[in-house]
C-alpha cells in the first residue's frame, strides 16, 4: 500500500485543462486486474479541451512513491529491527503510459457567428424595462446554459441603436466541472443609455454552436426588444455604479 505519492501533471500542449476537485483524503478500493488484486484510488482527474486538430500527446507521467511492503518472516527480530512492524518502506516509481489522442476538425459549414461552443446549450434573455426616459439605463441579460466548453465560448454581441451609450459587458460564470465538460450557466449583462428620445428596436441575438448529439451546427435566437424612450431627466448614475462594480 502506498504511504505517499508525489507527481504532477505535465504541460499538455494543445489542450485547455481544468482539474476536477477531488476529496483530500484518498479512499482505496480493491480491484482485480490481470489476475492480481490491487488497492486503487483516483489520485487526480482532469478535463481536457483540445484547442487544435491532429494527433495530440499526453506525455508519460512518473510518480515517486513510498510503498509499505509486508515482510514474510517468522523471525521476531525482523519485526524488532523494523520498529515493531511487519512492514518495511521501499521507494518505488510508477510510470504511466504515453497517450496519443486523434482530434478531428469540426465539420465545414460553420455559421459566420460561430461562438466556438461545442456541447449542448440553450439561451434566454431578459430586459429590465422597455419604457424609459433619456439618460436612464437599460440592461439586457443573456443566459447561456448547458454542458460543454462553456468557459471558452465567445460571448454574443447585443446590437444597440447607434444613439445609445454602451458599456462593457459583465460576465458571471457559474460552472460545475463534470466528465462531459463544464455544466452550468454563463450570465452576460449588457448596459446602455439612450441619449435621444424615440422608438428603438434591439434585434434578436444569435448564438451558434456545434451540437455533439446531432453532430450539426445549431443557431439559437433570443427575442427582439422594442424600446419607447421619452425625453426626460432620467438618471442612471446608481445603475451604472452598481453595474461597473460587478466583477467580471
Where are the model-predicted features located?
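Surface-exposed interaction/ligand-binding surfaces
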Residues: 1-248
